[in-house]
C-alpha cells in the first residue's frame, strides 16, 4: 500500500519480513521501534491489515506467476520502469508481470491511450488506427484491458508489431474482462506484457 503512510513506516522501520511477521503473529503489542516513529494508532492499523497479512504467501504467489511465464519486479530490478519514479510516495512497491518485461525500452517511448468503455465504433477505429501508427513509428502503447478504447489501442499496437503494456487491476493471473482472454494471450505471446 504505497499511499498508506503507516504502512510505509512499517516497511521502513521494521522491513518487509519483520513487518509481515508482526502482522501474522497474535497481537503482542506494538514493536518498540514503531512506538516512537509516528502517531499512528497501531492497534487499529494492525487489525485493519491482519486479515490480508494472514492470507499473504508471497513465495506461493511468485511461484504461480513464474510457472505462467511471469514474475515480480521491484525498483532495484533493471527492468523497473523508471517513469514510475515521478509518482513519489505513490510509486508502486513492485509490479507483477506476465510476458516480456525488457531491461531497456523496446521502443522509442510509450504513449497511453485510454478512453470510454462504451465507445462508438468510430472511436474504437480511431484508437486502433492511432495505436497502429504509433507502433509503426516505434512507440509502445500503454492502456488498461477494458472493453472499448483500451482494448482497441492494444489491438492496434499488436497489428503494427509494436510493444504493448496492459495494466490490470485484478492481477496478471486473473485478467479481466474474460471476453479479452485471447487478446491478453496474444499480448503475452508477442511484444506485450500484462502488469498489475
Segments predicted by a language model, with ranges:
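Glycine-biased, small-residue-rich flexible motifs in mid-sequence functional cores and linkers
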Residues: 68-196
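Short, small/acidic-rich helices and loops at N termini and domain boundaries
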Residues: 1-79
Amino acid at each position: 500500500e504505497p499511499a498508506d503512510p503507516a504502512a510505509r513506516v512499517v516497511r521502513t522501520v521494521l522491513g518487509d519480513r519483520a513487518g509481515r511477521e508482526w502482522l501474522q503473529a497474535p497481537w503482542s503489542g506494538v514493536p518498540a521501534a514503531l512506538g516512537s516513529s509516528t502517531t499512528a494508532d497501531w492497534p487499529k492499523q494492525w487489525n485493519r491489515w491482519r486479515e490480508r497479512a494472514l492470507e499473504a504467501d508471497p513465495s506461493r504467489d511468485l511461484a504461480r506467476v513464474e510457472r505462467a511465464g511471469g514474475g515480480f519486479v521491484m525498483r532495484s530490478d533493471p527492468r523497473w520502469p523508471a517513469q514510475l519514479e515521478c509518482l513519489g510516495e505513490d510509486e508502486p512497491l513492485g509490479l507483477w508481470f506476465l510476458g516480456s518485461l525488457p531491461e531497456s525500452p523496446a521502443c522509442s517511448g510509450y504513449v497511453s491511450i485510454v478512453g470510454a468503455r462504451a465507445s462508438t465504433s468510430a472511436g474504437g477505429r480511431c484508437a486502433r488506427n492511432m495505436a497502429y501508427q504509433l507502433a509503426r513509428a516505434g512507440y509502445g502503447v500503454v492502456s488498461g484491458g477494458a472493453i472499448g478504447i483500451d482494448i482497441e489501442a492494444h489491438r492496434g499496437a499488436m497489428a503494427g508489431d509494436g510493444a504493448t503494456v496492459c495494466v490490470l487491476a485484478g492481477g496478471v493471473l486473473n485478467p479481466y474482462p474474460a471476453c479479452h482472454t485471447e487478446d491478453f494471450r496474444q499480448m503475452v505471446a508477442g511484444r506485450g506484457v500484462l502488469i498489475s
